[in-house]
Amino acid sequence: MKDSQSDIIELCNKLNEATKLKRNGKSIKLTNFVSNTQIKLDSWKFLEWDYGKPSVQLPIQARGLFTLNNDTIAVRGYDKFFNVEEKPFTKETNLKTSTHGPYEVTLKENGCIIFISGLSTGDIVVCSKHSTGDRIDDNESDKTTTATATATAPTRNHAKQGEFELLQQFDGDQQKVKQLAHYLYENNLTVVAELCDDEFEEHVLPYPKDKSGLYVHGLNYNTITFKTLPMDQVLQFAKEWGFKYVSYLTYDNADELFKFLHKCSETGTYNGREIEGFVIRCHRQSHTNGDTDGDCFFFKYKFEQPYLLYRQFREVTKQLLNGTPINSIKIKKNKPITKKYLQFVEKLFEQEPEIARNFENGFDIIKVRQLFLQSLNETNGMNLLSIDSELSDQLKNLALANGNEGLSTTTKYIFVPIATIGCGKTTVFNTLNNLFPQWTHIQNDNISKKAKLKICDLTLLALEDDDQSVVLFDRNNSASRERRQIFTTIDQKRDEHLDDTVDLKYIAINFIPEDLSEEELWDITYNRVIQRGDNHQSIKSQSDENLVESVMKGFIQRYQPINTSRSPDDQFDHVIHLKLSKDENSSKSSLENVRIIIDDLVQNFPDLIKEKPADELINECFQKALDYKPTFVKNMTANTIKKDPTYYGIAMHYSSILENLEIVSHNEHFQNIKSHIQTEFHVTLGHIASSKQDKAGRVKWKKLVKTLGKGDPNKPKSALKFFADVKLLQIVINTDKLACIKVEILKIYDTNDVLQSEIEPINKQLHITIGCIPPATAVESNITLEELYDNPDEQELKPDGTYKCGDDTLHVFNFDNPDLKLFSQQLFVAYQ
């Protein structure tokens, strides 16, 4: 089964065109060399949130795609598939009507994905999801650096490990490898397997040596449309070629399927073995001429527990190893059993420091968990949840026995909107406050810029009151950095206001549907703001429409959708998704959103709303919210904003930087930083602080301001009509602190390509900060590089290695391509 070459050329053209997009379907291209050859393969991927999005039409839905010469699909993974209830089309009710059997239910093995394919040359291609062959970080064990450095341990390369496992499977028989490559090429197939080996990389479930290897779970045709072989043929292939294989079951109808899935989820096991869940393979219902043999379609059914608890154990252990006291470690759920686990681990690490060191390096994670289970005389992780419930009851009973209910845990809630101007958040929050007067509504627009107490301070002050359980945190929070600031500030200050018995939960109120385009968001919200005129504390469209337009565009440009799979949004305990109606009657949309919030809270937080308000009362309180007239006025005109820029920088293309982090993506020291990766990347040319250090700094700063201009002081960041070509030199990781990229500016030029040689960067060590682990901050990237390059006359780049600089341990990774350049990166000015 093959596509025509012209169809694949058209696909590659679309993929290449998509690399030029900024969002909504942008593709990222990586070029790899097939192992032990000079054959180039192009790897393609899209941004995670673009998959399964109705408003984004991707050229192909494959997750894991490699092409050859822009005319051949060499490797083809599965189409991206989603969990039951994760998307509208994977709701259980929809799946029962939109798909048909046979439903092949495969066990979800717990490792890293490996693709295997063959080329016409007889070469085998073994890939991870997005790379194949050698990388710069695959150091030889005897590699050395300078006298002050030690050799770094090899970073895990999944593709190379997959290749190694395959060769071992064939007892080192290279001829057998070539035979497999020939077979796959002739049949236009990609093998999809799971690499499970705890000695290489631990995940959640254990795979001892006798269970480790490549588990085949799919054979895909290398075609644009997703086509995969049925499991009986996959099993036959695996046995013929000596692979391990996943178990599977078959159900003919969806009712029997879901009955089985729900039953297994009660214990988190299948045949007495803990598993992560199942992948279900079926076909879409086709409505053409009554034919039901539709396209291949996958979905997954993941068990929530005990795997969320296992992951929480892993995360809190990292915090413990970083020196955070147990009482200060943030625990989202199952606090009693997690605290008991932490107390056990703290003692274990004191007695056996080798286990602690292994844990820091990504090993013995499962061993520690199993030792904890043994200490409780348990073998089943699901029983930990029962113990958690028992411990919780014991704490409550102890509090009652002591005549002090105050010792029991009290839950308080902060409702955090994710919105832009004009989404209706204040109307919705005013309505909720009218319905529930005991809730506190704090509007950021009512807080003066000069006020000492900001919105986070006022939130904590409100929650000090025993009678206050909810704060409506009325601010847009459109950018993820603003959400991060909420979590960070409240965590830092909560001990000044709340004791340990208060459990804080963050409820995200998402006002912007994921399928809404940027253009639609602008049209809806701008029309709403124009309609309300000056009835707002700061956004007065009747008085100054141009200023309002500028401010609104700034919010939309900074908007980053909520993504609970990564930091900081993974700290939300619950998300309520609202609607944003294109209807001219915007109040209708806001009233519907009030009802959505109430219904969700009644279902998920019954202690919060014990009795659902009557429709008449909701309508009455909503009308009162519509009649609301703000009395506080916040001056947003230009003369209230600082005229002096804070800093100048070069905005770096976000996706391009991310894709070049591949060389450290599996490095043990980078793992801790992964959850702290910044939401934007830039190179700082100069900061106003430099003008206050010495005369030379003042001269350079004034020259920057004069040459580049001040942009628009009404915006936090303003694009300038200058561009730079930037060379990426090397990645530097400061252990448990930060990661940054050392860079070189090749040239700066204006829109007419006229060189601007008079623009001189003030920063001595030009860099891009990738991410910082609190309390480290971005400014420490500069300090890190100054430590590493303490000789100002040193021109040569440090080779790969580990360097001890004072109290810091630095790890250097040079890029495989020594000529890695990003062109036409735009300069900007920032005001803070």
Swiss-Prot record:
Active site: 108
Any GO MF annotation of the entry: RNA ligase (ATP) activity
Spans through the membrane: none
GO biological process: tRNA splicing, via endonucleolytic cleavage and ligation
EC number(s) reported in the record: 6.5.1.3
Keywords, in A-Z order: ATP-binding, Endonuclease, Hydrolase, Kinase, Ligase, Multifunctional enzyme, Nuclease, Nucleotide-binding, Transferase, tRNA processing
One Pfam family here: tRNA_lig_kinase
Enzyme class: ligase
Reactions this protein catalyses: ATP + (ribonucleotide)n-3'-hydroxyl + 5'-phospho-(ribonucleotide)m = (ribonucleotide)n+m + AMP + diphosphate
Superkingdom field: Eukaryota
GO cellular component, one term: nucleus
Domains: entry comment: Has three domains each corresponding to an enzymatic activity, namely in N- to C-terminal order: ligase, kinase and cyclic phosphodiesterase (CPDase).
Function in brief: One of the two proteins required for the splicing of precursor tRNA molecules containing introns. The ligation activity requires three enzymatic activities: phosphorylation of the 5' terminus of the 3' half-tRNA in the presence of ATP, opening of the 2'3'-cyclic phosphodiester bond of the 5' half-tRNA leaving a 2'-phosphomonoester and ligation of the two tRNA halves in an ATP-dependent reaction.
Family affiliation: Belongs to the TRL1 family.
Protein name (database record): tRNA ligase
